[in-house]
Structures are given as structure tokens and as C-alpha cells.
Swiss-Prot record:
Main location (coarse class): cytoplasm
Catalytic site: 63 (proton donor/acceptor)
SMART domains linked to this entry: Carb_anhydrase
Keyword Metal-binding included in the entry's annotation: yes
Cysteine disulfide links: none
Residues annotated to bind Zn(2+): 93, 95, 118
Compartment annotation: Cytoplasm
The gene coding this protein: ca1
Residue sites binding substrate per the record: 197-198
EC id: 4.2.1.1
Protein name (database record): Carbonic anhydrase 1
Catalytic activity: hydrogencarbonate + H(+) = CO2 + H2O
InterPro entries: CA_dom, CA_dom_sf, Carbonic_anhydrase_a-class, Carbonic_anhydrase_a-class_CS
Domain of life of the organism encoding this protein: Eukaryota
Amino acid sequence: AHAWGYGPTDGPDKWVSNFPIADGPRQSPIDILPGGASYDSGLKPLSLKYDPSNCLEILNNGHSFQVTFADDSDSSTLKEGPISGVYRLKQFHFHWGASNDKGSEHTVAGTKYPAELHLVHWNTKYPSFGEAASKPDGLAVVGVFLKIGDANASLQKVLDAFNDIRAKGKQTSFADFDPSTLLPGCLDYWTYDGSLTTPPLLESVTWIVCKEPISVSCEQMAKFRSLLFSAEGEPECCMVDNYRPPQPLKGRHVRASFQ
């Protein structure tokens, strides 16, 4: 596998040399211009059903941390919205900045948030996540912005596991967590056709970006930044600025579920 990261030598502007699709027609993230998004009355409300017992573990993969879910049944799913069929939750992860003025991957009229949550789902018309990931309608990712405010009690349960996964390659069991507790109260969203935001940058994602952010405190953001890109025994390198900047829209349309 090609090494990639977020530094000056292996960061997003260098990915194209190993992953030429980085310059493709439907890359993510994007800057969402609310005025340029068209309201589509045909977009249904999102239907999310998550089973906390599907939650398996939390791990530091050296690019972010992710919480993984058992995806061998239809007990944690995303339906409706802009998609057809049933998509199963595979994992969720975050992207964040070194300071509170940056960190999200999507931006809204140029506004950056300090972090962004991604809930990754795969289309069950394909036999596995791995196969779905290369299909144009294979994945659906729900993106949620984090905005500085009150401490987020649901998020705190995730952050409390960080002591066990500080370094790259570490993982620990993480059970009975309901990811729906991380969703905003209002599920109005923008949607567009895009890609994974990390290599291999496959153009297989229906993006569903929630309009309403969830809260995170400054202290909680500091906890995100205590994770390490580096493995144990290596020089410590704080995990910050693990986001890809917005990519060209290239004629794509962004639709809104709300007026």
C-alpha cells in the first residue's frame, strides 16, 4: 500500500501521484454554497436505525481514529434520504484541526468547523463493504459538523477511550454505543455525488451533509488533538489537521432537503 498522510511530503496535494483519481470528476470534500444548492422536494427524510450492540471496537489507524461496527446483518442501517435500498453502518470517524478555526473537510460558504464526523455506510446490494467501495452507488456517508459550544456528553464516551488508543496501531473494545446520539436534532441535509476523502479516494460516495452542527467543547477538542499519528516508540507526532481541503465541483449539483 502507498504511504500517505497529511504532512508536507505526503499530504493531500501529493496524493494524486499515487492515486490519480484525486483529480477525478467527483472528488470530496467540497465547499457547499447554500445559495447554489437547489431544494429538491423529492428528497425524503433520512431513516437511521442503529443498534448499540453492533459496536465493536475503537482504533487509531494513524490517520484518524474510528469506531467499527458489526455489519453482518441489517440491524444498523441508513435508508431513504437521497438513496434507494439499505445501507449498513461500517464505521464512524472524525477529521479535525490543530486549532478551532479549521478541521472540517466540507465547508459551508467557506466557513470551516473545528471537526467533522463521518458515519460510513455501504449498499447491501453488494456482498461486502470492500466490493461496495468501488461502485458509484456503493457508499453513503453522513457528515456532521462539530461547533464549539457546550460539552457533548455522547461524544465524551468516545473520548474517554482515547487513553487506550493514543498511538497508531492501538485498538480496544468499545461496546454498546449508539451513534445516533451523535446526530443533530434536525436532520436537514445537503447531498451530492462524491468520493472517499482519504486514499484510495474512490468515487463511490453519496454524501449527506447535515445542515445543523453538534456541539463540542474546547476541552473536548483538546482531547482529539492528544492522539498521535505516530506509533509507540516513534517520535511523537500529534494527530491534527487530518483533513482534505475542498475539491472542485466540476459541474456537480448540490441538492438540499430543506428550503
